[in-house]
């Protein structure tokens, strides 16, 4: 059976998407080819991401940050999965060669407002969330696809409502009578005659 290709996307491809790539390769490498990329390209995989993955027996130290251009126009994917909110805003909504786009948002374990002493603990938590999400998806992909279908239908209905409202507003504007144009005042030049 031909393997399906899955691309995980985050902002810099330095933590969440790298962990997701490692988990998918480990859990279902016989069924999927796992890849990851970022909207931007980070300098390196975050050391904590490598550390917490090593703790569960998955070595991602050979992986490295890659940008979307690495794959654009060169490879098709069955799935692209956005794993962070910033990437959802900044990555293209459509990606050439992608059949299905999913959104699984995980918090940034190394966020700027997170104290250094909490970042490793956050990496553990996010790692476990990613593992659980991938395991659930592998066991019940139809549920995720049903949610996606329902979400797309909601978006379609919202677009239809917006288009209908725009038509109604145009129609209402056409029914409004044009403003009455008053004649322009004309200057009267009279001759003043002083009483005599």
Language model features by range: what are they?
Residues 78:
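Conserved acidic residues
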């Amino acid at each position: 059976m031909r393997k399906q290709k899955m691309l995980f996307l985050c902002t810099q491809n330095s933590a969440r998407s790298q962990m997701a790539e490692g988990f998918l390769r480990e859990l279902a490498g016989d069924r999927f080819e796992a890849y990851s990329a970022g909207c931007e390209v980070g300098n390196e995989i975050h050391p904590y991401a490598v550390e917490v993955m090593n703790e569960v027996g998955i070595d991602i130290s050979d992986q490295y940050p890659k940008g979307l251009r690495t794959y654009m126009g060169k490879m098709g994917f069955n799935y692209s999965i956005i794993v962070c909110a910033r990437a959802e805003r900044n990555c293209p909504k459509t990606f050439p060669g992608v059949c299905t786009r999913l959104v699984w948002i995980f918090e940034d374990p190394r966020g700027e407002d997170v104290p250094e002493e909490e970042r490793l603990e956050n990496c553990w938590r996010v790692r476990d969330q990613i593992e659980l999400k991938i395991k659930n998806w592998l066991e019940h992909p139809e549920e995720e696809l049903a949610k996606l279908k329902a979400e797309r239908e909601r978006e379609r209905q919202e677009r239809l409502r917006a288009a209908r409202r725009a038509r109604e507003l145009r129609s209402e504007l056409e029914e409004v009578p044009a403003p009455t144009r008053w004649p322009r005042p004309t200057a009267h030049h009279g001759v003043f005659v002083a009483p005599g």
